[in-house]
């Protein structure tokens, strides 16, 4: 479908790339690098090591696949290789950390909560839960609260849901990796506006306009949330 679109008009992608679509460029973050940043938050929360489960909507899209692999490679102290892919369904062990499972919920919030609850029961020594999509961390917090495991099992997240940021303020979430969707939108419109005028100079040379991810913890969550409210007018 996207290849057909690309033949008929100016096509760019943002947030999640589709490199095989003949799009002119991708605007967003490096999801593999963001995954490694997420893994670094796990290491900071569990300096002595521990067991981890990753939660995500699905792995069929590049952003999810690359985030997950970045987390895994960071925890296993591997070198950078965005093309590497560890298939789910196997336990991955390093010197200090082990990834017990990757659980996919197909964007079903009830299923996401059920998977979190099941993980808490199935793995009584579970150390950390990592949520790769925006809705995952708040749902993980709900499951942990019901199980009386808040602060016992560490939570690391992605994106800037209010529940996630409040969790960081309350000490229930160790940290989250955030994107800059405001900048994504701004740069995408800027590029499309120039392309519509026939100006291709606006395109990045390698086809990727990198808008870096940021790591949010208790040290900077208040300032970040204030900035976010200003940008969104909330």
State the predicted function of each range.
Residues 1-33, 44, 51, 55-57, ...:
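Flexible loop/hinge segments that line or gate small-molecule binding clefts
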Residues 1-5, 11, 71, 98-166:
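Hydrophobic alpha-helical
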Residues 3-7, 40-48, 72-80, 117-125, ...:
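Sec-exported extracytoplasmic/periplasmic mature domains
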Residues 12-13, 53, 130, 154-156, ...:
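Structural detector of well-ordered beta-strand residues that form the stable sheet scaffold
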Residues 17-20, 32, 58-62, 105-109, ...:
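Solvent-exposed loop/turn segments at secondary-structure junctions
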Residues 27-52, 66, 109-113, 160-164, ...:
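Hydrophobic alpha-helical segments within soluble ligand-binding/sensing domains
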Residues 30-34, 38, 51-111:
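Extracytoplasmic ligand-binding site segments that recognize negatively charged/polar headgroups
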Residues 58-63, 74-96, 183-234:
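Hinge/cleft segment of the Venus flytrap/periplasmic-binding protein
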């Amino acid at each position: 479908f996207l290849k057909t679109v690309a033949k008929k008009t100016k096509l760019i992608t943002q947030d999640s790339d589709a490199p095989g679509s003949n799009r002119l460029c991708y605007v967003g973050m490096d999801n593999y690098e963001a995954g490694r940043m997420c893994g670094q938050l796990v290491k900071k929360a569990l300096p002595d090591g521990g067991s981890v489960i990753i939660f995500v909507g699905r792995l069929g899209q590049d952003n999810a696949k690359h985030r997950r692999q970045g987390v895994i490679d960071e925890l296993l102290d591997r070198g950078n290789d965005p093309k590497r892919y560890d298939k789910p369904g196997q336990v991955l062990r390093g010197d200090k950390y082990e990834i017990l499972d990757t659980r996919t919920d197909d964007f079903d919030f009830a299923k996401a909560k059920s998977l979190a609850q099941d993980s808490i029961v199935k793995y009584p020594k579970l150390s950390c839960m990592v949520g790769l999509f925006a809705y995952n961390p708040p749902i993980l917090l709900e499951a942990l609260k019901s199980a009386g495991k808040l602060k016992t099992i560490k939570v690391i997240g992605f994106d800037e849901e209010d529940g996630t940021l409040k969790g960081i303020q309350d000490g229930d979430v160790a940290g989250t990796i955030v994107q800059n969707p405001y900048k994504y939108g701004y740069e995408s419109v800027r590029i499309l506006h120039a392309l519509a005028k026939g100006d291709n100079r606006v395109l990045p040379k390698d086809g990727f306009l990198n808008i870096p991810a940021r790591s949010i913890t208790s040290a900077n969550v208040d300032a970040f949330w204030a900035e976010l409210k200003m940008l969104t007018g909330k």
